[in-house]
Amino acid sequence: MNPQVSNIIIMLVMMQLSRRIDMEDPTIIMYIRILYCSSIGISWIIYQMARKRIVAKNDMTTMKYVEPGNAMSGEGEKLQVTTVRDYDLKEIDSAIKSIYTGMAMMGFMHLYLKYTNPLFMQSISPVKSALEHNEVKIHLFGKPATGDLKRPFKAPSLFGGMGQTGPKTDKKSIEEAERAGNAGVKAE
């Protein structure tokens, strides 16, 4: 099933469950906090296990790709030269940072604004996201890096595939970027 569709289904189910729970009861609020914190902890452990496997594997295969430019800032496409290990670590570190960002937002909404419902709604999402992350699929579940799991990963489009949203890996695009002087320096 498509991850976006399953996210919507899970959110609808969680909304129905949250209507049946007394969000004013301090005992239930404590259980919701424990559920959310354990969910965050489990997802953090999953990402750390994947990170450990990436470092242990130490795949120094060089990869080149053309990163799409940012239309908002007017930047053009840029050639990126990196290793599989560095790319994977960058992806995992980005996922870990997203956990911290989500915790900050939930902390603000729950502790400062006194909302408990979003805390309950987000109690499943971090673990689901961690288990669906491409790096986790490759390094923890042992799936081959082909098809959708081929590096560099394409970002999922909000509008279901209208326009290209991922980096270009074809030889022509890489050669054009090298000739245009948009080459990046290999990070070591």
UniProtKB/Swiss-Prot annotation:
It comes from the Eukaryota. It is a single-pass membrane protein. It is found in: Endoplasmic reticulum membrane; Mitochondrion. Keywords: Endoplasmic reticulum, Membrane, Mitochondrion, Phosphate transport, Phosphoprotein, Protein transport, Transmembrane, Transmembrane helix, Transport. Pfam families: Pho88. InterPro entries: SND3_fun. The modification Phosphoserine is found at S157. Coiled coil: none annotated. Residues 168-179 have a biased composition (Basic and acidic residues). GO terms for cellular component: endoplasmic reticulum; endoplasmic reticulum membrane; membrane; mitochondrion. Residues 157-188 are annotated as: Disordered. Functions in the SND pathway, a SRP (signal recognition particle) and GET (guided entry of tail-anchored proteins) independent pathway for targeting a broad range of substrate proteins to the endoplasmic reticulum. SND functions in parallel to GET in targeting proteins with downstream hydrophobic motifs. Involved in inorganic phosphate uptake. Also involved in telomere length regulation and maintenance. Present with 61800 molecules/cell in log phase SD medium. Interacts with ENV10/SND2. ENV10/SND2 and PHO88/SND3 form a complex with the translocon in the endoplasmic reticulum membrane. Belongs to the PHO88 family. This is SRP-independent targeting protein 3. It comes from Saccharomyces cerevisiae (strain ATCC 204508 / S288c). The lineage of its organism: Eukaryota, Fungi, Dikarya, Ascomycota, Saccharomycotina. The gene is PHO88.
